[in-house]
């Protein structure tokens, strides 16, 4: 099953785990030093830019060195966080795979239930229409079984016949005269 199963449950909120904003917040709480290092790098670059505009080359060189230190700090935070949270991330990945498998099974089960309901409705519709057709055939057979009675009725009670049209009514009047 490489393709997802079609269903009306596709966009159901029950089948969504975590949004990108929730994931960003979770990662920010897990490793707060990485965004801190990125902010320090950005601030050092900003100060170096201002020093360059002011023409202060000594301050600009200090800020470029500070940028390098901030980037080193960020890199160390990434590596240390990866080592510290490595086993937890592996467990989380396994958990997310299990959750994904469970959710895909739930979607598949919901899709199958939906198909079963549609199949029951379809069978019910076919049975109703088969019963209606059988009743119509039975009524037609019952009507054909007494043709003499129909002929006698039409001869006795012409006023009860449905009018077929104006032209036929005029022809009937002319034929009586």
Swiss-Prot record:
Membrane topology reported for the UniProt record: Multi-pass membrane protein
Coiled-coil residues: 96-116
CC per GO annotation: mitochondrial membrane
GO biological process: mitochondrial respirasome assembly
Segments of this protein annotated with the region Disordered: 139-158
Domain of life: Eukaryota
Pfam families given in the database record: HIG_1_N
InterPro entries per the UniProt record, alphabetical: Hypoxia_induced_domain, RCF1
Domain HIG1 positions: 5-96
Family to which the UniProt record says this protein belongs: Belongs to the RCF1 family.
Subunit structure as annotated in this protein's UniProt entry: Associates with the respiratory chain complex III/complex IV supercomplex.
Protein role: Cytochrome c oxidase subunit which plays a role in assembly of respiratory supercomplexes.
Protein name: Respiratory supercomplex factor 1, mitochondrial
Species, as recorded: Aspergillus niger (strain ATCC MYA-4892 / CBS 513.88 / FGSC A1513)
């Amino acid at each position: 099953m490489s393709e997802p199963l079609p269903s009306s449950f596709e966009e159901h909120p029950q089948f969504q785990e975590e949004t990108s904003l929730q994931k960003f917040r979770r990662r920010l709480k897990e490793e707060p030093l990485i965004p801190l290092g990125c902010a320090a790098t950005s601030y050092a670059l900003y100060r170096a830019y201002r020093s360059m505009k002011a023409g202060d080359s000594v301050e600009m060189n200090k800020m470029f060195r500070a940028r390098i230190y901030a980037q080193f700090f960020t890199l160390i935070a990434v590596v240390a966080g990866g080592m510290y949270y490595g086993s937890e991330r592996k467990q989380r990945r396994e958990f997310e795979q299990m959750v994904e498998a469970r959710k895909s099974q739930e979607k598949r089960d919901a899709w199958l239930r939906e198909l079963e309901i549609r199949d029951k409705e379809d069978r019910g519709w076919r049975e109703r229409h088969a019963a209606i057709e059988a009743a119509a055939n039975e009524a037609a057979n019952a009507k054909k079984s007494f043709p003499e009675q129909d002929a006698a009725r039409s001869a006795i009670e012409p006023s009860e016949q449905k009018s077929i049209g104006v032209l036929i009514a005029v022809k009937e009047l002319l034929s009586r005269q």
